[in-house]
Regions:
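Active-site beta-loop-alpha junctions enriched in small/polar residues
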Residues: 1, 27-29, 63-65, 90-92, ...
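Glycine-rich, positively charged N-terminal anion/phosphate-binding segment
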Residues: 1-76
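Alpha/beta catalytic cores of nucleotide-metabolism and tRNA/nucleoside-modifying enzymes
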Residues: 2, 8, 122-124, 128, ...
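Alpha/beta enzyme core
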Residues: 15, 72-85, 89-99, 110-187
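Hydrophobic faces of well-ordered beta-strands that scaffold small-molecule active sites
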Residues: 22-24, 58-62, 85, 129-133, ...
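Short, charged, surface-exposed secondary-structure boundary motifs
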Residues: 32-34, 168, 222-228
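Short glycine-enriched, charge-decorated loop/helix-capping segments at active-site entrances
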Residues: 37-39, 100-106, 233
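Flexible, glycine- and charge-enriched loops at secondary-structure boundaries
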Residues: 105-109, 171, 238-242
Length: 318
C-alpha cells in the first residue's frame, strides 16, 4: 500500500498487535543498483534485524520489470531483509503500469518466470523469495499460467489479490479464483482482497480454501482487525473503542513528526482518517475538524482535545 503503509504506520499497527508479519511499501527497481540509504529510509526495520519495534518480522518488497536488475537489487536487499524478499506483480497504479511494472507483468507469464528465477538464483537459499499477484490484467485468462510461472520460477509462496488490475479495488473480490489457483500450484497461497471484518475473513477462508489471509486496507480501516480475528478483541467495532483509535492517531502523529524524512504529516493523518471513516463515524467528524489545518502540531492538539473532552468533533464518547 504505497503512500499508506509506510514505516511509521507499520510501527503503530504492529504495536497494536495480532500480525504474523508485514511487508514494506514496494521499493522501485529500475536500471541501477539502489544505494543502501534507500533501504534505510524506506525500511528502517533493517536496523532492528528486520523486525518492527514490537518484534513483527518485516519483508522488503521490490517492484520492477527487469530480471537482471531485480536480481542484483534483491541480492543486496537480502543482506538486510533476513525474513524474505517479496516481488510485487499486483500493483494496479497507472504510473507503475505504464513502465511495465506491477500488475502489467501478468500479461507475460514467461517474464514472470524469468524474474522470479533470476531473483531466486541471486538470493541466498535460506532466504525465501515470495510473490504477490492479481488475477490478471483485464481478465482471468492467464491467472493459472501466471501462478504456475511464479511457482516454477522459485517463489516459496504466493499472495493472490482476488481482482484483476482493471478491476482495481472495486468490490467484489473473487475469492473463488484464489481457490482455483491454490489447486493449481503446490506452494502455500495467501488470500487477499476485500477483508474488512471478521465475517469477511471467515468467508474469504471458506471460499478460497486458504488458511492464511493478508489484510491491507482492512487493517488501516480497523487497526484492531487482526486482534479481532484472533479473538483477542470484540468481534465487531464499537464506539467504546474510539478512544483507542484516537491514541493510535496521536502516536502516529508523534512518530511522523519525529522522522526527519517525513513531510506533509497533516496529509498522512487525513489519509488515515479517510480509511477510518469506514469503521467509525467519529472519524468523519474529526476529519472535517482538521480538514483545513496544515500544521501537524495543531492537528495533534485537536486530536488530543477530542480524546480529553467529549462533545468536541470526533471526541471520545463518554
Amino acid at each position: 500500500m504505497e503512500g499508506v503503509a509506510d514505516f511509521v504506520l507499520r510501527d503503530v499497527l504492529t504495536r497494536v498487535g495480532g500480525y504474523d508479519g508485514c511487508v514494506s511499501e514496494f521499493v522501485r527497481v529500475t536500471g541501477s543498483l539502489l544505494p543502501a540509504r534507500t533501504y534505510e529510509r524506506e525500511t528502517p526495520e533493517i536496523r532492528n534485524g528486520g523486525y518492527t519495534a514490537s518484534g513483527t518480522p518485516m519483508v522488503i518488497q521490490l517492484l520492477g520489470s527487469d530480471p537482471e536488475w531485480l536480481a542484483r537489487n534483491a541480492a543486496q536487499a537480502a543482506t538486510v531483509s533476513p525474513h524474505g524478499i517479496d516481488l510485487n506483480f499486483g500493483c494496479p497504479a497507472k504510473v507503475v503500469n505504464r513502465h511495465g511494472g506491477g500488475a502489467m507483468l501478468l500479461a507475460t507469464p514467461e517474464l514472470l518466470h524469468r524474474i522470479v528465477s533470476s531473483v531466486r538464483a541471486a538470493v541466498p537459499a535460506h532466504i525465501a523469495v515470495t510473490a504477490k499477484m492479481r488475477l490478471g490484467v483485464s481478465d482471468t485468462s492467464l491467472a493459472i499460467a501466471c501462478a504456475t510461472a511464479l511457482e516454477e520460477g522459485g517463489a516459496a509462496s504466493l499472495v493472490v489479490h482476488a481482482r484483476t488490475r482493471d478491476h482495481g479495488y472495486r468490490p467484489p473480490a473473487h475469492w473463488d479464483w484464489i481457490a482455483r489457483i491454490a489447486d493449481a500450484v503446490h506452494v502455500p497461497v495467501v488470500a487477499n482482497g476485500e477483508v474488512w471484518t471478521v465475517d469477511d475473513w471467515e468467508r474469504c477462508r471458506a471460499v478460497s480454501g486458504c488458511d492464511d489471509v493478508m489484510i491491507g486496507r482492512g487493517a488501516v480501516s480497523d487497526p484492531f482487525l487482526a486482534l479481532r480475528i484472533r479473538g483477542q478483541m470484540a468481534r465487531a467495532p464499537s464506539d467504546a473503542e474510539w478512544p483507542l483509535v484516537l491514541r493510535c492517531l496521536v502516536d502516529y502523529l508523534k512518530k511522523l513528526h519525529a522522522r526527519i524524512a517525513v513531510h506533509h504529516e497533516h496529509g498522512r493523518v487525513k489519509l488515515w482518517l479517510s480509511y477510518l471513516k469506514r469503521t467509525w463515524p467519529q472519524a468523519a467528524e474529526l476529519h472535517a475538524a482538521i480538514r483545513r489545518l496544515q500544521d501537524s502540531i495543531e492537528i495533534q492538539g485537536v486530536i488530543e482535545n477530542a480524546l480529553a473532552q467529549p462533545g468536541r468533533p470526533g471526541a471520545a464518547n463518554g
